[in-house]
Each structure stands twice: as structure tokens, then as C-alpha cells.
Amino acid sequence: MSGQAEGSTNTEEVPRFRYTAQTAAEIEQRWQRRWEELGTFHAPNPAGSLKGEVSDEKLFVQDMFPYPSGSGLHVGHPLGFIGTDVYARFNRMLGKNVLHTMGFDSFGLPAEQYAVQTGTHPRTTTEKNIERYLTQIRRLGLGHDERRRVATTDIPFYRWTQWIFLQIFHSWYDTDADRARPISELEAQFAAGERATPDGRPWAELSRTEQRRIIDSYRLVYLSEAPVNWAPGLGTVVANEEVTADGLTERGNFPVFRRNLKQWMMRITAYADRLIDDLDRLDWPDKIKTMQRNWIGRSQGANVVFPLDGSAGSIEVFTTRPDTLFGVTYLVLAPEHPLVDELTAAQWPQDPDLRWTGGAATPAEAVAQYRRAASMKSDLDRQENKEKTGVFTGAWATNPVNGEQVPVFIADYVLMGYGTGAIMAVPGEDQRDFDFAEAFGLPVVRTVQPSEGFEGGAYSGEGPRINSANPDVGLDLNGMHLDEAKKTIIEWLESHKHGSGTVQYKLRDWLFARQRYWGEPFPVVYDSDGIPLGLPESELPVVLPEVADYSPRTFDPEDADSRPEPPLAKATEWANVELDLGDGLKNYERDTNVMPQWAGSCWYQLRYIDPDNDQAFVDPANERYWMGKRPELHGPDDPGGLDLYIGGVEHGVLHLLYSRFWHKVLYDLGHVSSEEPYRRLYNQGYIQAYAYTDSRGVYVPAEEVEERDGKFFFQGEEVRREYGKMGKSLKNSVSPDEMADAYGADTLRLYEMAMGPLDASRPWATKDVVGSHRFLQRLWRNVVDENTGELRVTDDEPAIEVLRALHKTIAGVREDYRELRFNTAVAKLIELNNLLTKEYSATGAPRAVVGPLVLMVAPLAPHMAEELWSKLGHDGSLAHGPFPEADEQYLVEDTVEYPIQFNGKVRSRIVVPASAGQDEVKAAALADEKVVAALDGREPRKVIVVPGRLVNVVG
């Protein structure tokens, strides 16, 4: 299923100077060497080792950096890379100082798993893979400033990842100031008595351990004994985001269990409001903003207190619908809720409903069995599970608005991380509650009047409140609609001390530890009291030790009771260390977890700015220049950040949310001037491909499949075609090297940009690549004589219609490049080149048109453009421009074409002078022979002229 470059098989049959794959290869290698020698894409900084003369006009454009896998790139990977390069090259030609580089997100599980299997150090594998990627990327002619390249696994890089971790560790969130502050300021407040301790004792009377416990409860990084996702088969915990809907790990498909473990957490929830509110300040796709808003899940509602019967205790519930309190018929706690053990009754009540007991002899037995089953499900699985399960705890609570007793259940569809880990169930208005009530025989009370025609079940629509009054407590919501009812019930709850209005979030704090080897070590040690201490900057970097075994201890994938044993714990000489942390030499124990793969990607754009700085993670002057706020360009609410960030929509929540969080902490602490890392975000689409399976369902090599009469065959057997991702496992992967060998890198670049809008997915078709190659050949022929190699251009004045076409193309292509519409830019360039071929094939095209055309092609096909620009007599590179500007006088049309509609159908077209008035246009339309024939001697009933657009004749 492949195409063949024109004239690339038998060089004896083609002219000597034709643009072939071989010609392209020679040109591309020559210009890539020259760019490297001249430092063509080096972007100067205002300060530091890369200091140079900087322009006020700058552009910082960045790709989401790749993980260097062992399989290398396929043609789908460079789509975004080429797109950013085209945009960067265009802006560089406009005279801007453009920072564009590429790094590698190189920590990760695949290299570690390969190390476990082969004994090869992950660094060896990673560096080999990076070199392969670089070879492929360089061949594409991407204009990167390679001085700025980083990899997250480089020790000088992760030294600063560790440093940033310590800045966050040594910070707390001041809710009054609404920003992070150094932890030392919090300690000073306690010491001065400006902030009270939890039990009211003076700070000086507390022991060191008590003081640390209080301080640590405020930190933005803290240790927590909390429910985590434990994957015994991997030997590590994983974040919620790394668990599939099936309750398995994203990598390896291992079962995941919920269990309590002590883990590092980052208090991202402190930034929930700012992370939501500042989305309005960003030039991002609405889809990504919605994804982040939904992930954070800000909900306004109320906390309601339900007293427990026979106890002084109570259950606090968060609800977004306090107006439905009269419809509460039971409560549900998350299985992990700390109150469960306390409130679980010793015995069942007399004659319990067997649906409530789970077949257990006592509530405690039922709860224990259910908790174990729930621990084997992921949060996503628990939320999406359609079969409602649960058990009665034997406890009852009182509904504060009507005094009704309601049973208390535990059920896995309630999660500990959202709200209070407890819900009030209103089966009349919530489908999950309704399904649970039906399964357990619980009553349903409606509190909202359903609309006419409602057929039963839970009613989630709007309507007046019903069944919602209790005169004994002075509360009547009946007849009210939502907003009024919510306001009234919250006021009642607050005045009667039964609850309060509040805001809750779905977002939970970020689990920030992995039991792996190949990751950033934590810059933390534990003293003899088990207190975690951040290392001083002089002790950085904490370098990964050499170990004999790279794997964490793994367990039977179903062994939910196992506990993590990280591989770094095996490096005992490294883990047990003697240090002087200011109070003499003492023995400490290093933290043996590593950071998640997300850590390096949270801040790498800042290191691109200042990659050689060994005194700071970034010089403030360089950060201000490249990422600082520019209200004069972007409006008064500009948060700053790099100018364009391109990557896949799959990173819409995790990477982007984590990176925004880290950046905001750095901003609060005064380390950066920008409030956001990415001012503008653009999601490129995907290149997809056909894959083929035989009768066994086994994938067969796509390039060996033949098409005959609309059917597909592999080695004579008919195969089934499917459309989707491109990848090695699907045997439909196409290497960019293969395409560059067959056509040249410029052809591949042009084809990928011409396939469709950059933000849309599109099918790969090798047979169509030759079309882009032929365009470049035709462009070459308009400049170079294929037989002699001589220039074909003339110094003749272009015809006026050619000048109009040229300047119309310049105006359109400039706009297309500016708006990332590269496919339409290609179409305009092809159209102009075709005009030159048509008008000047015999004589040669005018230099005044050829030169601008070559410059316009340069961002897309830079190697060929450089070669043609050189042949046109220019000494330097065109990489820094100038990009052509349109002359307005040629954009004004002398004539206007009007389509003529007769009774609603287009029957003809007329061309009139652009200066023609409506009467002249009307007369010309009525004189058109097709209109005359359609009227057949009749007078038209109406003639409507829409200036510049159409004439509508009603006969």
C-alpha cells in the first residue's frame, strides 16, 4: 500500500537536475549542516550564558516533549513537531526572536521494565532511544535551538526538579492572602502567638514532634496515611489518573486495590479555585477548559449535620441540593469513612431485611466483607458500576428537617475524596440513589414536581418543591423553585445550627510517590524520630544509586494485603546516610520512593529558557523576557506564559493541571513573574491509519496488503480492514525515515501539513505523498532548468493579473500561517505555482514573483526554499526573512463576479466593473442570455442585488 516518488527509480530516464529524492537528500543534508554551523536557530537571552542582543518582539513556541520509546517515531508523531516548526519559522522570518527547542520526558516505566528484563541500566536504554529520536527529528529539518535541549533524566535537570520540590515542601497556603508562603513565616506566626495552636497551648510548650506535626499539617507537600491505588503486580502505587475504567493499571493492566498507605501528597486542592478561575484568562480550546473544570469539580452547596441515634455523634454530609432534604430516606458512607467503625452496630435489629445484611451474621462482619470487596475496585469503576451494592451498618440517623429516622449504609459508589465521604440519598431526584433504593427496598419521596408526561424513576428536572414543609420547625419550601429553595434551606440550616453553605471539589490532593527505581529521588531524609527533613540545597542533587536489581518487589497481582518495597530500599549504603544538617553529624534514612513521571514535565519550559544555569533553575531576567506578562499585546488580564504550546488532547487534565499548579506555587513564592505556564494552547489532531487482520484476528503488515476490486488481500488471503491508531503492534506503522528516503523530508513536511486542519485527525495514505512531491518538483522547475541546472527566472515585469494573484496569495498565506491553517496555506501556494507554470512555462517566470513564492514556501519546505533562494543569488539564509508583505493596491479587484439566481437557482454568472452601481449590475444581469431565456419575454417580478455577492431574479 505504498506510492513511488516521481522519477525516483531510474535516474537515467529523468533529467539530470530534476528534483528527486536523491536531490532532496543532498540539499537537506547540506542545509542542515549549514544551519548547525551558523547557529541559525540560536535564540539569544537577555542574561546568562546564552546572552545576546534580543528583540522586543519574541516568540516562545513549544511542543509537548516526547517520551523516547524504543520503537522510535512513526509519521504520526511529528505532526505537531512540524506544525510548531512551520509557525516558528514564519515568525522568525517576521523578525522575531524565536525560542523553539525539543527535550525528552525520559523517566518512565518502560525503560525500567526493560532494565528488569535485561539488566541494562535504564539510563543506557534511555540515552540510546534519545539518540535515535534526535536522528529522526534532525532529519525533518526542525529548526530547534539544540543548546537548550533537556531530558528529565539528566542529573543537572533533576537537581532543579528536586529543588522545586523543596520549595513546595517548605511552603503552606495562606487562605487569607490566597497564595503560598514560606513555611518559616507560619512557624513565626505560631511562635509569636499570632496563630493559635489546635489545643490552645503556647507554641513554646509543645515538643519538637508536636510542633512538626502541626506545621506538617499545613505544608503543600505532606505525608498522609490515606487510601491509595496499590498495584501488587507492579509493586507500586499509581495515581487515580493512571487507573483505567476497568480498575486496572494503564501500564500492564494489573489489578488495582484501595488500601491505606503512608504516601507523599501534594496539596493541589489549595489551588482549586485559582486553577478554575484562571482558565478564563487563557487562550485554550474550550474542550480542554471544560475538561479541567469538570476534573476540579467545584460545587456550591451545603454541609448538613445528621445526628446519630443513640449516640452523641453525627454524620456531616455535603450536598449540592440541600433543597431536597425532605426527600432523604437513607444515608451512605464511603467504605473507608473513619466513622464506619465507630457507628457500626454490634447486632442486627430484629428481623432485618436480608437485602441489607449481605448475608452476614453481624453488621461488623458485613462491613468487613464489603470493605474488602470495595478495595479491589478503582474509583472510576466504583463510580461507573451500574449494579448498586452496599450493606447496612446497623446505625440510624435523624433527618434534621423532619425528624425522620434514616438508615446508614456503606456503598462503594460513594468516594472518600469528594465532599465529606458521606451522602444524603434522595432517590426521588437522583438516579443512582433511586437504583440503590430499588435494590434495597428503601422508600422514595419526591420533593420536586415532575413535568407532565414523566414516567417514573428519578426526576432530575426543574419544577416547584413539593412534600417539603415542616411547620413545627418553621420551614416551608413548597412551591419554590431551585435558587429560592436553596437559599431558604441554607439560611434555615445555619440559623438552627444544622449545617452551613459551602463549596466542595472533586479534585483530590496529588499522590506524589512511586515505588520504582527510574525516577527522581526525593530530597528528603528521616531523623531518628521519623520526622521528614528537606535537604539543604548544598546536598543537591540526590543522585540515583547504582543497584543490582531495578525492580520493586512485585507480588501476586491479586494479593491486596501486600505492601510496597521500593527498589531504592535495597541500596542500603545509599539509603542510610550520615549528614550534618546544622546540628552536627547524625544518621538519617533517605526516602526510598521516587517522584512520578509528571514531575519533570511540570516545569521543563522554564529550563528551556536557561538550560546552563547552575545557580538557579532560571534567571529571573530570562523568565520575564520569554514568559512574563505582556498586557500591551494580550490585554490587561494577561497571566503570562509561553506563547504557543502544542500537544495532544490526552494531556488535557493531568500534565496541564499539574504544571499549572507547580507554576502557580513558583509565582506565589516570587520565583517567576508569570502566573501561568502556557498562555496559548493548541491541540493537534492525530494521523491515523488503516490496519488489517486475517481470519484469526491477527494483524498483518499493512505495506504488504494488496487492494483488488475494493477488497484487501495479504498473501492471497482476504483480510479485514479497520481504521484507527498507527502503531507498531498494529503493523501499520510508517517510519518518517522511510518517507524521507523515498521523497525527501520537505515532501513529508509538506504532506503532513497539507493533509487537513492541524487540529483534526486525518488518515495516512502513503500513495498520496507523491502529490506533495510533485508540487515541489513543479516549483523547482519554475526556478531551475531540469536539463541544464540553469536559472529559468527572468527580470521581466509580471503581468498585472499575476501581481494580483501574488499579493492575494501573500495576504492569505500570512493570515493562514498566523492562525495555524497550514493546509489552506499549501493550497494557496499550489494555486500560485500552477499559475506561474501556466503563464511562463515557455519563457521562465519573473523574479519578482518567484522570489516571494520561495519565501512563502520556506516555513513548510525549508531545505528546498534555502536552495532555491541561494540559486536566486542571495548569500545568506532566508531563515530570518524577510517574509513577503502584500501590496494593498493589488488586493483591490477591478471587476466583480456575480452569480445570478433565477427563482432560487443559480443560472448564470456575470462580470462587471468593481465600481458598477446597483442599476448597472441589474441591467447586466437582465441582459444575460440565460436570464433572457428564462424570462421568455416576461418582465421580472423582482430583481434584488446584494452588492459584491449575488443577483436574485424572481420571474
From Swiss-Prot:
> Any idea which UniProt keywords this protein has?
Aminoacyl-tRNA synthetase, ATP-binding, Cytoplasm, Ligase, Nucleotide-binding, Protein biosynthesis
Gene Ontology molecular-function annotations: aminoacyl-tRNA deacylase activity; ATP binding; leucine-tRNA ligase activity
Enzyme group, top EC level? Answer: ligase
- Give the domain of life: Bacteria
The positions annotated for binding ATP are 728
One Gene Ontology CC term in the entry: cytosol
Question: What is the protein name stated in its UniProt record?
Answer: Leucine--tRNA ligase
Q: Which organism is it from?
A: Saccharopolyspora erythraea (strain ATCC 11635 / DSM 40517 / JCM 4748 / NBRC 13426 / NCIMB 8594 / NRRL 2338)
